[in-house]
Amino acid sequence: MVIIVKPAENIRLDVLIATHSEEAGLLFKTVNGCRHMAYPDKSKVHIYLCDDNDRPEIAKLAHDMGIGYFGLSDNKLAKAGNLNHALSKTDSPLVVTFDADMIPRSNFLMETIPYFSLPEMILDHGEWKK
């Protein structure tokens, strides 16, 4: 089944990229992949680097790439703490999370977001059913 994002369904969403100690070069690739995801209204896609080491060079990378940055210097709760910190600062109805070494396909949003607007649909053993 292929479902396409309709204009009325292109709601705001936040893309959170969790990082702990990954190098800027790796993060550049991940952010670049996220920036190139297709979506009908790209102004509704907000990408953030969530850095639980609060590194100045990663904040600069985020700035240079035109995305948001959340630094967290006193994280005691690992990735969950990092993402919860970011979630406390965002308000989009949908959130996508990626690890620092995940590069999404350009069609990721176009193929996943429509499922959130299907009424009474459930995922049952890998199949969408009413």
Language model regions located:
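Internal catalytic domains of large membrane-associated glycosyltransferases
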Residues: 1-130
